[in-house]
Amino acid sequence: MEYNKLYFNNELSMCRFTYIYMRGPFGRYTTSITPKGERIGHIWISRSIDLNEDMLEELMVHEMIHHYVQTIDGVSFDGLFQHGRHFVRQIKRIKKRYGLVIWVCCPHWHFRNEKPKYSLSSKVIGYLRNNLHLF
């Protein structure tokens, strides 16, 4: 995959990919363990949001960072919502080396046919996650 080569030096193993309707998160990463003990990653992308090319790249790389943390770093629990120290380290590396900004959450995105809602609490949570990397 192009992003694996560009951002992860082709270190990532293949993982499953599903494009599915999800009302909650825009993307999700899960793993399963094979009978041989191998960890298999699965990236889920929501089709309930209109993604342009830049958004898709950001979302895919975000989920690939989860894949990296679990399969390369070998860390199965990385802080609250899996956006801890190992995840943030990869965000900073990618931003510094390639200029790509990966958000922990994307408060500026919204679902199809839904007007964006920017409550004070969502702005505060977005700031704490993205700027301070608290969770």
Model features per residue range: what roles?
Residues 58-71:
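Active-site recognition of the HExxH zinc-binding catalytic motif
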Residues 1-54, 71-135:
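Metalloprotease/metallohydrolase-associated module, dominated by Zn2+-dependent proteases
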